[in-house]
């Protein structure tokens, strides 16, 4: 039983003023602009866009600033805004093979068509604090080169030998589900699972992915490929009879390659885990691909022996906005509930004390 209690209007207004004051900080310092957040805190912006399921860098930056850097609060704000937007259709599946690649690495082949493109990455930094960032020291311009040969997919190389499962195909006339408009039902189709994972909490997915590497799941993965870059978004217009471009978005894609010994329905081969997220977030994409493969137990006749393989456990707990709402609702008044519990504990304590006293008297009489 929950009891709604309206706080004092003046107290709430003062709390909002105090929040705005803390958000602004020292008035002697210039306020952070939205452009600064977009350009200099880009990975935070990318995470908010990904987990709010709304690709808009300026709005995500505004949410980050409004939330004082609290990522989950920013995601909540942007997701709430998303519900106010009109929906006018579904785009065509993005073709990541045509991606304008900025970063592409593979752990399976050293030399492959298109080469290894390191791009902007922390992988080779020393993780030491850099005092030069405190000031306004100039930053060297990057060295840019013309693109070379076509950046071929690693999965296409393996597919040429027939050693990896093919790209998943939906039945004729299949309409993709929409997790934001339909209640969750289990077992859940893979397209809906991927939607849930794409907007799931990065930390939760990272922990689950890590668990699969520590023995809680049957995966032996290799990073077939991680690629980051821009892809074109197209929408088919019935009145024209063909798709038109709406623009480009930046995404991170990961294809995880896993060994599979075969089953009664499938031959020995490599299987895939897939991850695709807005912006640059390869940790999230890699975690998503590991969890995606772990959840495909029914396709490969595998037993569910670990949390990462349990659809209901994973999907029901991946959403950080939902999780935050349930955990933080405990701050709301539960006065009636607590009074009932308090009365119950007091009564049980009286009964316990009476039983203890009766037991002592009985022992005393027996001794006499």
From Swiss-Prot:
Sorted keywords for this record are:
Plasmid, Transferase
As its record notes, the protein acts as a catalyst of: methylphosphonate + ATP = alpha-D-ribose 1-methylphosphonate 5-triphosphate + adenine
The UniProt GO MF terms for this protein read: alpha-D-ribose 1-methylphosphonate 5-triphosphate synthase activity
EC number, as in UniProt? 2.7.8.37
Per the UniProt entry, what are the Gene Ontology biological process annotations, in alphabetical order?
Answer: organic phosphonate metabolic process
Protein purpose: Together with PhnG, PhnH and PhnL is required for the transfer of the ribose triphosphate moiety from ATP to methyl phosphonate.
Give the protein name, as stated in the record: Alpha-D-ribose 1-methylphosphonate 5-triphosphate synthase subunit PhnI
Source organism per UniProt: Rhizobium meliloti (strain 1021)
Show the taxonomic lineage: Bacteria, Pseudomonadati, Pseudomonadota, Alphaproteobacteria, Hyphomicrobiales
